[in-house]
Amino acid sequence: GDLTVRYVPGESDSLMFGGNSNWRGPVWFPIAYLIVEALERYHHFYGKDFTVELPTGSGRHVTLQGAANEISRRLTRLFEPDATGHRPCHGSYDRYASHPAWKDLLLFHEFFHADTGRGCGASHQTGWTALVARLVRKS
């Protein structure tokens, strides 16, 4: 049969590798953070004359630092409340947006749904997901 690798934005929908095969679509903070750092370092070397199209197909070109800033902004936005108090990282759990005791709580999930930003996996993954603090500090 045909072998394919499909894009899966959240939890794995396959039993490959025992069901733990969700490394090909979701947002993983350690990888995203390393990409931001790499783009910043390459910008330091190549400077403002080296640009990339962002987003692809848009015709808009930015420096590598600009690309790093955009990725950082997207990552930090996962934790920012909208006008109604909902944060993408909390998905559809209204309690975190409306309940006074919960509305300021941030859960540092293991990984995030690439299309919606909803936190997936362990909700107490304060280790690598806490890298968002470094991104906030840099901005």
Regions flagged by a language model, labelled:
Residues G1-S139:
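Acidic, mature catalytic/reactive cores of soluble proteins
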